[in-house]
Amino acid sequence: MTPEWSPLFGTATWDSMTESERVRLTRSEVAQFLGVGIWLEVGLQVALLRASHSADPARSDVKFLFNECADENLHSLMFVNVIDSIGSHFYRRDRSLDFFGWLFRTIAWDEVAYGIVLAGEEIFDVMQRDWMASEDVAAPIRRACYIHVVEESRHMAYARQKIRTRLIKISRVRRFISTLIIAMGTHLVAKSLINRRMYEDLGLDWKVVGPEIDANEHHRIMFRRAAEPFIEFLSREGLLNFGARWIYRKSNLL
């Protein structure tokens, strides 16, 4: 990734690192970010395929879903191969995120499932547009980001339309509940991008870098920038009430 997207950029720890240490750090952070993206996309596929398991496979919407899943699986394979090519690896997630993933796959309904995944897609889209344009980023990452940005634009448009369509038919109570659950899910996704195990694997003291990340205003600014398109969409569609705003602020996304 570009150095500016590292949660540690501008901190005392960052300033004390050599260039090779910064490269190793940002490559590990890319692996963490993309690992969360893969986990999120697989969860959505499981939820949608379960809902369509008994449907007529010749239906146009089911065929479209098959195409979407095929694309997402190719993206996941691409990211796995890219992370391997730069000498990094994926890191184990926190157990709370795995529990949330189980809930997401099992009970998330349409606008909630698409809303949480759209949050991740929108945030990664902003990040990857920077990464693919920077000479500071490893060539395999730049190529993968370019492919993903181009192909994912159709998926994001589809997710937005699915959310809009569902919102037409739902009650005020369901809209209120969905708004809060989307916010809570997005909060967990955003927080999962910071993985204690990854920093400790690099030999960094979490008791030092954890507070540095929490206090890093540059990191908060970059995350808010990444979330801007998603927050604007929520505002337009009436999915941004007082409670949701509070959660997004806690996530450094608003």
Model-derived segments and spans:
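Non-heme di-metal
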Residues: 1-254
